[in-house]
Amino acid sequence: MEACTSKSSLLLHSPLRTIPKLRLCTTISSEDVAYGRCNLTDQHLQIEGKNYSKNTFDHIFRTDATQDDMYSAFLSDMINSVFAGNDATVLAMGAKANGKDERLYGNSVSRNGLIQMAITQLMNAIDDNKDPEERIQVRMSAIMVSQKDSSIVDLLSPFNDPRHRVVKLVDDARTGVFLDNESEIRVETIDQALFYLNTAVDHRLIQDEQTHRTSHVFISLSLYSYKMGDKMQGGRRRLCFLDMGIGERNSTNGGMTMPALGSILLAMVQRNKHIPSRDSSVCQLIRCALSTSRFTTFLFSFGSKNDDNENIAHLACKIARTRVKSVMGHGRKPSGTFSSGTMDSNGSSSSFGTTTITPGGTPRTQRRFELESGSELSAAETVIFLGPSCSRTTSPASTTMPSTPTSIRPLHRTTRNHSGVDPVSKPLSVETKSSPTHNCHDGCIHSIPPMLRGHTPFLSPHLKLYDELCSPPNSSCASPVLSAPNAFGGKTAERRDDFGIMIAQPHIPLMKAKSKYNLDDGKMKQIMQWMETSEAPPILFSSPCYENSATSLDELRECVGILSHPLEDIIEQEEESMRTSTATTGGSKKDHPLRILSKQDLNIDSEAKDKDETELELVMAASLSSMRSHDILAKLEAMRNAQSGQNGQNGNIGTSQSNTDMDVSEMDMYRRASHLEEYAMQRVREIEDNKMKNKKKVKLGLNCCQQQSMISSGSTVVDWSQIERKKEREKDAMEEEKRKEVLRERRAKLKITELEIKRERNMIDKELDDKKGIANSIARQLQHFSLSPCRGGRTHRSVSTHRIDPPNASLPSTPTMSHKKMIGGSLAKLSASGASGSGPPSSPSLGYHQSLPRHSKLPTAVNGRRSSAERDRKTSKNSRNASSKERRSSGSKEELQWRSPYAQMTSPKTYGGPGTSSSGRGSSAPGSDFETPVVSATEKTANGTMPRSKRQSYSASSGYESANDYHIYATTNKKANILEKKRNEEKLFLVRQADEIRHRQWQLKKELEEAKRAIGQEEDAKMIANSSDQRLNGLSRTTMVDAMLQENRILEKRLIACRNHSMLVTTFI
């Protein structure tokens, strides 16, 4: 498919008139084709069964497309754009898939990802197009942002920032969005850049799918260029790679989803003022990547989720429609290929140079009149300094700006002539230096690659003082100055090693350089001895090199210089040291404070100054972190003034510094002063420690007197309250440690107990695994188990099932002799069976899972009650018939001469006295309490008379008593009969309840014995089988019933626990 054809964005005077170039690309992997996610036809791209126009994308890379095809399609033009002075961004968006990772980072064999190819071609283009008047430096940074917790991680901080400063995304109304405290590491070779890239990529490739969705990696390659000549110009261009995830699957977790990320990208492409989720870290990262970009390429890829692929396709279509509207709104038609140029005031375009780079060819670059910067368009990343200058003369031609075409956009410049003399220009000498070798570097930074041994591209320049003291300028280097200086390498005029590039003054004789530091041999030896032997206080810093037992003094010294510098807040941490010097004439010292260029400086009239000097204009394009330079320089100036006042009082230091013939740069002076200050603090600490050791212990009551005497004598006062507080803190710490020790012991005991429990469980599991028969029996039994409390038929009902019984179900029948005999016999049988361990023949089946009841209730079924009632009625009827027959056969013939076939004669009974008698239906009832022997007709009384004849009933009602005697029975024995009946009912109820409870207890024991045997506890099963209830003998019926109910509850709980355990084991098996 043809490349994206839109006219190149012209670099005009106003950045608002510049339209960023936008390309849309997509990749189709072999997995997408195999699973039917994407299919490409002649006119459509089918994604998840839906057709999309092929014109939506500028490039569609099939499965057979190589990395070189992708490079030639869009990456080469982006590198050309960077060399032309623009920022460029590649935004790769898609789910975690092998195709996406291979396109961006390459595989483990070829390692030909897009980022690797961009680094290689960029470094090769810099090496092949060197210019003696141009310095180019490449810096690399890698940031990862997680939208889950809004955290920002600097992936290269272990190589650049031992203090691990917090990286922030700052949204400034004037400068835009920028990264603060990010680690920008200078890379000089391809191997170094690939090493840092691999370190950053490792964090991305090891992420799981969910973490990949919610995290985004931002890798940038920044080109800092400086052009030397009559005027100095510089700037920064940036090539960014933004590897974005696709967000959360849903918004329930509070994270940003794919539509939310798409709305942010659309707002950035449309250049809307309102951007959704403006304060989120993800939105700020996207703004940081796209706000200054003049050339943006979207690279979409697809994953395994259908909805994610549809969202990506919809986003691509929206961006394509937005691009068409923006191009048509500005009156430009997509045509031509990418080029870069400028337009003059007449409308004619004048090309200032392009670079064509191919993966296999050599870049061809035409020289440009002036360097342009993509950061210059945003007017946010260039800081202009006016530093210490030297008196020089310039030519009249240099007082005015040389005539340049309107297409060239120079940076801010200021030319001031305070002396009124026509200056004569003198060219600057730009010397470069090679990086020194530090043997102590490995102790501070632990992740140095093998290729960087002996090289310190990222260390702070604070150690230059020590290096220069160890190697004085006249003896540190014997090699001559290189005739053809190389960018960021070589030797300086002072013949010593240094970091980076130095913009030096005109050549100074070597003899004057010897007195640079104004230190005699004694002071130098003292400083060297202190730096070799001193140890930094632990409260100032905590360095990882001490944790790894760094024994070298060089390692300790370098860690002290980096991490515990007293003035580190006013010294900028950079890899190269920008050193400036001033030349003096006539032995007079010129004092020129550092300041930042402002509008007030531009408006000052050159004739208002009385000083005979001309300041040298140094313009340097700095990174965004240099925006703090205003505060830094203000602090530096204040401390320099304070130091000059102290030098006036101190004669030794003031004399040694006033006799110098050459000014020392402010940076070196304050480095030296910081070391002396640290040395003084160390000495004070040692003196105080010695005094504390030599001080004798005194009584507590004399502390105040001694303190006053010490104040009066002018000696050092010891703060005893602080010492007491320190002791209290130590005591509290010891108590806390003791409490922790007790907790540790408890935790150890708990661990031992836990191990024993696990060992027992393992033994049980092992036994169950060895005995397959037990497992099979448990499985067969569990087939009848039920988790519900009411499962099964009428014959299998749970104990906890609450049933509403009929009101007469628990009422006893009329107590007769036959009933008493039956009850006595049943009790005797049950006691005998309970003692022998045997039970009734019909026991309930073990076929249901029994839950723990809330309260115990006797299980009485309706069928059982009905059968027992019928059985009682049949028994009472049979007993009545038998007794009636016996009485009829054994009745006295004297008493009954004849009998009616329709009535039954009842024997009279005496009650209430000898003269009262009655007969009725209650007198013939067998087992009655009122039954008496029959009186014969021949029996006589004591006086020889016959007893009064008892009235006998021969009526058809069979035993109705006469009305004359009934009232006597009702009034005399009614209360006694009711009380006796209640006692009998209570006794019978207790007997029945005890019988049923004992029967239930026997069932529970049988079931518990079987459950114990099923889980392998044979001893417990034997104990349960041999247990008896002889211990309850001798107790009252009520106490015995309560005790048996409590035992039944315990047995139910044990049975439920055993069944649940067997079910758990069977489930695991």
Swiss-Prot record:
Q: Which InterPro entries match?
A: Kinesin-like_fam, Kinesin_motor_dom, Kinesin_motor_dom_sf, P-loop_NTPase
Cite the post-translational modification comment: Phosphorylated by unc-51.
Keywords noted in UniProt: ATP-binding, Coiled coil, Cytoplasm, Cytoskeleton, Developmental protein, Differentiation, Microtubule, Motor protein, Neurogenesis, Nucleotide-binding, Phosphoprotein
Write the gene name. Answer: vab-8
Q: What does this protein do?
A: Required for posterior migration of cells and axon growth cones during nervous system assembly. In PLM neuron, regulates innexin unc-9 gap junction turnover by suppressing unc-9 transport out of the gap junctions.
Q: Which PROSITE patterns match?
A: KINESIN_MOTOR_2
Annotated region described as Disordered, given as residue ranges: 328-374, 391-436, 572-598, 786-960
Q: Give start-end positions of Polar residues composition bias.
A: 938-960
Query: Where are the annotated segments for Interaction with unc-51?
Result: 331-517, 517-719
Question: Where is composition skewed (Basic and acidic residues) in this entry?
Answer: 883-897
Give start and end of each Kinesin motor domain: 15-325
**Top-level lineage group:** Eukaryota
| Protein source organism | Caenorhabditis briggsae
Region feature Interaction with unc-73, mapped onto this chain: 403-877
Where along the chain is composition biased (Low complexity)? 339-364, 391-407, 824-847, 906-928
Naming one, the record's GO cellular component terms include: striated muscle thin filament
The family classification in the record reads: Belongs to the TRAFAC class myosin-kinesin ATPase superfamily. Kinesin family. KIF26 subfamily.
State what protein this is by name: Kinesin-like protein vab-8
